[in-house]
Amino acid sequence: MAPGLFSVRLSEEVSTALADHRPVVALESTIFSRLGLPSPHNEEALDRCLNAVRSGGAVPAITAVIDGVARVGLGPDEHDRILGADAKTSSRDLGVAVGAAWPVGVTTVAASLRLASLAGITVFATGGIGGVHRGAANSGDVSADLGALATEPVVCVSAGAKAFLDLGGTLERLDTLGV
């Protein structure tokens, strides 16, 4: 277990890798759920990502809330649970997801960075980060991902901000936050 306001359960593989000082890469789980990609593309993406991390010599650590427990590292027998999940969990939702014993909460970039940090993992990979939404000047719609990137001591490897966002606004916000 990692320290924090709630416990974080590490898989045996992730725990052993960290104890042995081997590389571990945290992964979000929203993209692998039906909230991120339709089936069967979500399962194919999951397999490709896990294989890519392993072929690079690291241990993949999928983050999620499973049966009310914040998890870092899932076994193959748990993959179906995230593939079919429909409850997205951001960093603000982690305490609720754990306290209310959500059956499955797939994690956003912000939640994944938080769980990775609590677990002592310093590298996180994702396809795209959230950012400043178009029209944010009126709506205030800015992803929690940006705040997490600024505050969690975890390197994020990503293709960049999602294309539907206000990319200029996202870059400005990242600059303001010192990212």
Regions found by a protein language model. Name each.
Residues 29-39, 43-98:
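Glycine-rich nucleotide/cofactor/substrate-binding loop typically near the N-terminus or early
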Residues 25-27, 60-65, 98, 104-106, ...:
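General beta-strand structural signal in soluble alpha/beta enzymes
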Residues 87-111, 138-140:
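Glycine-rich oxoanion-binding loops at beta->alpha junctions
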Residues 114:
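C-terminal binding/interaction regions
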Residues 119-179:
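Phosphate/pyrophosphate-binding betaalpha-module
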Residues 1-55, 118:
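N-terminal glycine-/serine-/threonine-rich phosphate-binding loop
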Residues 4-15, 38, 104, 138, ...:
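Catalytic-core regions of core metabolic enzymes
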Residues 1-3, 35, 90-102, 152-159:
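Short, basic, glycine/proline-bearing loop/turn elements
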